[in-house]
């Protein structure tokens, strides 16, 4: 995938966050999956944050921004690092981006089998569940009419469905 196109889509989404610009950027990120976006990268940022390497988190997240730009958790980690360094403006911007990404993820579906949430990254599932204060009992990958779906069952029996066919 052309990096210039991804950067253009990021700029379009940040300039005008809409369902359309979110979906376009999401499709472009999915198409560029060969660039090795790995959950280990988020894990590394989380580990660095836990060790108090706040400058390292910000530096590393600058490198990873183009790959993780639609991840609520990525922006949350950036915001926490900025907050620990006393940069209130950067922390507020990261919180706003985290909330914006979460909002558009939740707008991508309603969590039913017929209209699952279309996640960009596998970590988006946990972010959505946490936003609704839901605790999962179990999780299962199933074949859906348009690809792979993750069904997460809550402790009260409610099922939340996620389209993970292209999840990074």
Question: Could you say what each language-model-derived stretch is?
Answer:
Residues 41, 75-78:
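TPR repeat positional signature
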Residues 58, 78-79, 98:
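Heptad-repeat amphipathic alpha-helical coiled-coil interaction surface used
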Residues 68-70, 102-103:
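Short coil turns that delineate tetratricopeptide repeat
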Residues 1-62, 101-105, 112-168:
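N-terminal alpha-helical interaction modules that lie
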Residues 83-106:
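TPR/TPR-like (Sel1-like) alpha-helical repeat modules
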Residues 38, 72-73:
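Helix-start (N-cap) detector for alpha-helical repeat units in TPR-like alpha-solenoids
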């Amino acid at each position: 995938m052309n990096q210039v196109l991804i950067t253009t889509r990021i700029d379009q989404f940040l300039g005008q966050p809409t369902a359309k610009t979110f979906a376009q950027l999401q499709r472009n990120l999915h198409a560029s999956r060969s660039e090795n976006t790995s959950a280990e990268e988020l894990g590394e940022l989380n580990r660095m944050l836990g060790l108090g390497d706040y400058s390292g988190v910000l530096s590393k997240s600058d490198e990873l921004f183009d790959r993780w730009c639609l991840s609520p958790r990525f922006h949350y980690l950036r915001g926490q690092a900025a907050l620990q360094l006393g940069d209130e403006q950067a922390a507020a911007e990261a919180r706003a981006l985290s909330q914006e990404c979460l909002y558009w993820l939740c707008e991508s579906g309603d969590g039913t089998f017929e209209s699952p949430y279309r996640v960009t990254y596998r970590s988006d599932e946990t972010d959505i569940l946490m936003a609704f204060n839901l605790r999962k009992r179990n999780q299962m990958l199933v074949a859906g009419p348009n690809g792979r779906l993750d069904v997460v069952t809550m402790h009260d029996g409610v099922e939340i469905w996620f389209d993970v066919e292209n999840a990074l």
